[in-house]
Structure formats: structure tokens, C-alpha cells
């Protein structure tokens, strides 16, 4: 039991909820490789740091000798997961889904051991359900139970449309667990309802219900919303070391500690020590550098991490980037010149255009050459001349 308690303590690190912990302990006592499932719909071409929170936990199960299944939702991706959405997500074409799935397959191996990872596509069984099978599946849940889900409840109360296929989505994801006879399923906190549907469907199928483990959602570069490619507040795991370093350094000091909790492999005692050092006067930028280097070393190499730090020093610190630079947020895409004016970095749009022509404007350290550049959803550090800086989020 002591060994199980040790493993359990490691598995609980960074976890939001285990449903149920007693079930997990019973499964661990069986002393066999457990089937641990993580599903992802390839709705965008790249995996970002937000995805790695659950992937890191999957990797941990892998290290403890369990059977890891990474499920690519090539079927459910064409339906569209309504979790956390206040509008219907437009379904993707099969070509889009398969194209994105290829990059997922490549990028997960930056985190998971390819020799110990089983990749499956849920079209293998969902595509074979047919009309009769779909009717049997949907008979397991009522509309009333579906409306217990927060996002559906809010949309129904606000008279916002809910498409029938959105009700079906949790059942399809739950059926994945039946098809795989999963022991454990991982997901973000926004997936809790779907994971619990899987437990119910497994009971109906005569299987032991899976343990549902939810993990917190990583807040993106803007410091407000969950990391998402559509919001532009993300860092992709395939981005260059230089891009990664600059983006990590752009996050707020408060957000940095959340990222340490969810992304760092450092012992909790070491993270607590770093917090104490900051409270005692150490510059938070030093601690942010450590996080940036840890992530770059993980997804690239230690040599890349060192080189990215040096390039950052050459670009920014030698340009005396202020520690207390203003942070601003604007709604809707806008032209670069207007953004610089609204951010207080120039007096007028004509001055902004002139500074761009003279090579005096940089975004995340990269010189801008197009004065007519349109800035879409993103978070970046804008520099005008050698002394004017602002961290700007465009939503």
C-alpha cells in the first residue's frame, strides 16, 4: 500500500479532480497495466502548451508502466466539441481533420514515448455505428440530463441555439471509452461532463467505469482566457526556441506561477523556494528565464535554450527593456499604426508609419517592415525606438 500511496501522490500533482479517487486506488491495486485514454480532436494544425498539461500527465502514467492510448478524434472532430462554447462550433471537413491529425501524431512525441504510445482513430468504431447503433447510443441519455451541463444550460436560458449534433457529441466521446474499455480518461476541467458520460455508458455496457481525471486549463499569454490558437494567446510546441523564449518572457509575473504549477517538472519544494526568493527581492524576470529555458530544453534541446536566452539578452536587455512596461488590451483587429498610437508609443499614426520606414518598430524583437500590417488576436511586446515598450493583447 505504501508504494500505491507514493504513486498516487505523484499522479495527483497538478490534478483538479479525480472521479473517483477510491476507484483509482482499487485499479492501482490490481497491479496490471491500466488503459489510460486521452482524446483530442484535431481542430487546429498544432499542439500548444495548453495541450501539454494533460499530455504531461499521460506521460507520467506511461512512466509508471501503464498502457497509454492517444485517441485522435477524426470522427468527433467533424462534429465539433461544444464544451465551453456559447455558440455552435462549425464542423470541419474530413480533409482538414486528417491534415491536422498528421501534425498531432508528430508533435505528441515531443512529450510521449513513441515506443509506448498507442494511437487510435475513433472513426474506426464510430464510423461503423450506423443509424441503428446511433439510436441505441442516444437512448442512453435524456435531453433533461444534457441540459444539466453548464454551457448547454446557459445557452438554453439565453435562448441561444443548441444543435442536435452537439447533444450527441458527449455520447460519441463516451462511446470511445466503451470501445477501448478504458480504465482511466484524462481531460481538462471543461471535459468533466463528457468524461462522466463515458463512465455511465461503460456501466450500461457491463464494463467497470473509467476513472475520470481532470486537469486545470492553462491560461494563455493574455492572462485571461484559456490558451487557444483561435484567440492567438498560445505557444505552439513546434515554435522556434527564439519565439518560445520571447513569448514566455512576455507573460505577467502572476501568470508565471500558474505556468510553473502546470508546466514545470521541477519539484514543488523547488518552486516554493523560487517564490520565496522573489518575495525576498529577486527579480521575477530571472525566474521566468528558468521556466522559458526548461520548456525550450524539453521541446528542443538545452543548447537551443541557452542560445535563445542569449539572443533574448542581445535583443531586449541590451536595449534596456523596462521591468514595468505598460500592459494594454484592445478589442478587435487593428492596424499597426493605430495600435502604436493607442498604446502611447507614438504621438500619431504618421509618426508610427515613419518609425516603421526607419526600422524603429519591433514586435517581440522582430523588426517590422510593413507599416500597413494588421494585428489580429495575439499578445506581444511592441517596441518603438530603443526605450518605448508595451505589452499589448489584441482580442
Swiss-Prot record:
Cystine bridges: none
Catalytic activity: tRNA(Tyr) + L-tyrosine + ATP = L-tyrosyl-tRNA(Tyr) + AMP + diphosphate + H(+)
Record-linked InterPro entries: aa-tRNA-synth_I_CS, aa-tRNA-synth_Ic, Rossmann-like_a/b/a_fold, S4_RNA-bd, S4_RNA-bd_sf, Tyr-tRNA-ligase, Tyr-tRNA-ligase_bac-type, Tyr-tRNA-ligase_bac_2
Alphabetical GO biological process terms: tyrosyl-tRNA aminoacylation
Subcellular location field: Cytoplasm
Pfam family name, one: tRNA-synt_1b
Enzyme class: ligase
Entry's Gene Ontology cellular component terms: cytosol
Key word DNA-binding present: no
Motif 'KMSKS' region in this chain: 226-230
Motif 'HIGH' region: positions: 42-51
One GO molecular-function entry: ATP binding
Domain of life from the UniProt record: Bacteria
Gene3D superfamilies, A to Z: HUPs, RNA-binding S4 domain, Tyrosyl-Transfer RNA Synthetase
Function: Catalyzes the attachment of tyrosine to tRNA(Tyr) in a two-step reaction: tyrosine is first activated by ATP to form Tyr-AMP and then transferred to the acceptor end of tRNA(Tyr).
Oligomer status and interactors: Homodimer.
Protein name (database record): Tyrosine--tRNA ligase
Lineage, broadest ranks: Bacteria, Pseudomonadati, Pseudomonadota, Gammaproteobacteria, Pasteurellales
Gene, per the UniProt record: tyrS
Amino acid at each position: 500500500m505504501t508504494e500505491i500511496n507514493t504513486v498516487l501522490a505523484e499522479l495527483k500533482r497538478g490534478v483538479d479532480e479525480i472521479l473517483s479517487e477510491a476507484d483509482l486506488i482499487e485499479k492501482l491495486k490490481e497491479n496490471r497495466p491500466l488503459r489510460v485514454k486521452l482524446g483530442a480532436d484535431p481542430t487546429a494544425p498544432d499542439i500548444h502548451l495548453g495541450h501539454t498539461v494533460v499530455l504531461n500527465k499521460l506521460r507520467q502514467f506511461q512512466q509508471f508502466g501503464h498502457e497509454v492510448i492517444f485517441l485522435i478524434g477524426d470522427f468527433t472532430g467533424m462534429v465539433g466539441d461544444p464544451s465551453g462554447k456559447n455558440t455552435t462550433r462549425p464542423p470541419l471537413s474530413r480533409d482538414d481533420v486528417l491534415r491536422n491529425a498528421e501534425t498531432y501524431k508528430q508533435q505528441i512525441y515531443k512529450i510521449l514515448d513513441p515506443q509506448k504510445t498507442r494511437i487510435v482513430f475513433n472513426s474506426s468504431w464510430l464510423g461503423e455505428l450506423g443509424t441503428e447503433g446511433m439510436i441505441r447510443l442516444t437512448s442512453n441519455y435524456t435531453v433533461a440530463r444534457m441540459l444539466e451541463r453548464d454551457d448547454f444550460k446557459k445557452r438554453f436560458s439565453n435562448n441561444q441555439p443548441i444543435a442536435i449534433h452537439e447533444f450527441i457529441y458527449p455520447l460519441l466521446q463516451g462511446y470511445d471509452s466503451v470501445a477501448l474499455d478504458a480504465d482511466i480518461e484524462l481531460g481538462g476541467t471543461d471535459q468533466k461532463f463528457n468524461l462522466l458520460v463515458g463512465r455511465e455508458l461503460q456501466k450500461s455496457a457491463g464494463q467497470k467505469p473509467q476513472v475520470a481525471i481532470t486537469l486545470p486549463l492553462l491560461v494563455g499569454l493574455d492572462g485571461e482566457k484559456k490558451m487557444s490558437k483561435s484567440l492567438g494567446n498560445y505557444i505552439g510546441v513546434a515554435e522556434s526556441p527564439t519565439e518560445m523564449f520571447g513569448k514566455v518572457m512576455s507573460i505577467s509575473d502572476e501568470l508565471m506561477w500558474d505556468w510553473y504549477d502546470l508546466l514545470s517538472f521541477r519539484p514543488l519544494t523547488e518552486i516554493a523556494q523560487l517564490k520565496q526568493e522573489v518575495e525576498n527581492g529577486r527579480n521575477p524576470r530571472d525566474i521566468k528565464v528558468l521556466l522559458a529555458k526548461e520548456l525550450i530544453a524539453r521541446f528542443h534541446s538545452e543548447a537551443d535554450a541557452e542560445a535563445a536566452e542569449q539572443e533574448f539578452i542581445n535583443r531586449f536587455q541590451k536595449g534596456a527593456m523596462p521591468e514595468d512596461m505598460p500592459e494594454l488590451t484592445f478589442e478587435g483587429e487593428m492596424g499597426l499604426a493605430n495600435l502604436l498610437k493607442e498604446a502611447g508609443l507614438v504621438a500619431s499614426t504618421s509618426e508610427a508609419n515613419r518609425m516603421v520606414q526607419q526600422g524603429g518598430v519591433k514586435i517581440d524583437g522582430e523588426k517590422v517592415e510593413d507599416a500597413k500590417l494588421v494585428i489580429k488576436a495575439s499578445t506581444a511586446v511592441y517596441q518603438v525606438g530603443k526605450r518605448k515598450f508595451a505589452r499589448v493583447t489584441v482580442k
